Amino acid sequence: MRFSKAYIKTLKETPKEAEIASHKLMLRAGMIKKLASGIYAYLPLGYRTIKKIENIVREEMDRAGALELLMPVVQPAELWQESGRWDVMGPEMLRLKDRHERDFVLSPTQEEMITAIIRSDISSYKSLPINLYHIQTKFRDERRPRFGLMRGREFTMKDAYSFHTSQESLDEEFLNMRDTYTRIFTRCGLKFRPVDADSGNIGGSGSQEFQVLAESGEDEIIYSDGSEYAANIEKAVSELINPPKEELKEVELVHTPDCPTIESLAKYLDVPLERTVKALTYKDMGTDEIYMVLIRGDFEVNEVKLKNILNAVEVEMATDEEIEKIGLKKGYIGPYKLPAKIKIVADLSVPEVSNHIVGSHQKDYHYKNVNYDRDYTADIVTDIRKVRVGDNCITGGKLHSARGIECGQIFKLGDKYSKAMNATYLDEKGKTQFMLMGCYGIGVTRTMAASIEQNNDENGIIWPVSIAPYIVDVIPANIKNEVQVSLAEKIYNELQEEKIDVMLDDRDEKPGFKFKDADLIGFPFKVVVGKRADEGIVELKIRRTGETLEVSQNEVIAKIKELMRIY
């Protein structure tokens, strides 16, 4: 491709709406164009990278034995009503009607569609297992689209779905997809971690995310320095270290003026936070039921764990009005001598604290020497604790934190959708069984953005060779110098013959202008044909390292091929 013929409109200044590196650089490099909030056109330069990522995904999915198909973007509402997710998905799912007033949705995901297809065609165990995938546009009406392609409303994803007759078969395919995703992200030149994750609205029994490591990542991931353990903060667990047990004492009501928080209470009574139990009130946003949630004073509640335990769509802290309406006193809530009927969820840490301090439901008073079992119990006792950096890992070592961008996720769905949508088969004995499902997604456009977040500097993008829109930029320093132009054309043609993606910057611009564009766009290699062109010598510049090599025109192709294997 000749730069003069390419559709590349670079910008000197960063548009005001851009906040993170990938958004800024894709706009400046002329890779995307914003058309509406969270909706972008992929311009030729950006689309080349998208296609390269898609090709890597296709090659590895095909290698893993999956079969490609293409499902529609518009789906009938009946499928979502059948699965039970028509109401669960909320306003993020865009609903629409056709001219006959029939309800449809603009696809946010494809579990319902693929299950409907498979159940109509497969009826015997002999046709299973099978894994089908497609690469398709998705739409999720995000409340607050931001960060460019990182959290847009329209995006490209690879979805794969597998169907099985046994848990062993599903487990095997889950590991197959884990290995496949590892190869995909490795080939894309990314630093990443597979981490245990929450399944969210998709559901199922097991899930892992593939987190691309970047300081700008929205997700916090937890990992051990002494084992392979890694998890999203929403799912992470750690060793619970309990305070020493004490002989049980009699409950006392103590005056605690101006101590509405657990920190102020512990300071006033001169006790460690771990000897207190804080009571929080949460509301199930689906049922409006209020719960009292108990946790040791030095810990925080993991709201995702709480949501899952309650089987809630979402949970939020109850308002002051809601708390008072059920007879509780904000700032002094506790489980002992409870004045209201309310279900209690307690963290595993709570029963292990002897003689703890809790609220009394009276302003400026607390109970001390309260003990679980003797003085109160909870309806549910389970892990709802948010882990902390420095905690002991359950598999050894200490826990650390990093930021990540979720670019892929794999799930064991089990029979959630097959039961809801009656996707069955006949087993070897002729008995009807529900299929077991797996689900495997990769955000293609997000992967492009994540790569930039991980690979950039003050001058622009630094593409890995495997997904760079063009690998080499050939630049004649002086477009009016026939020797330079002739040699640049020769190298350009030779690179094309070798099937290496190459751009010839044939614009009549100053060299510095061209160099800045090349660095902004992120070509892995620049071949600058300059003053030594008459000697057959060119400069080969490596974008990632900044290194410049002087290379003979007869060796430049071989050198580029060698460097491509490294970068």
From Swiss-Prot:
Subcellular location: Cytoplasm
Record has ATP-binding as a keyword: yes
Record keywords: Aminoacyl-tRNA synthetase, ATP-binding, Cytoplasm, Ligase, Nucleotide-binding, Protein biosynthesis
Protein name: Proline--tRNA ligase
Signal peptide range in chain numbering: none
Top-level lineage group: Bacteria
GO terms of molecular function: aminoacyl-tRNA deacylase activity; ATP binding; proline-tRNA ligase activity
Organism: Fusobacterium nucleatum subsp. nucleatum (strain ATCC 25586 / DSM 15643 / BCRC 10681 / CIP 101130 / JCM 8532 / KCTC 2640 / LMG 13131 / VPI 4355)
Gene Ontology biological process: prolyl-tRNA aminoacylation
Catalytic activity: tRNA(Pro) + L-proline + ATP = L-prolyl-tRNA(Pro) + AMP + diphosphate
Top class in the EC scheme: ligase
A cellular component annotation (GO) from this entry: cytosol
E.C. no: 6.1.1.15
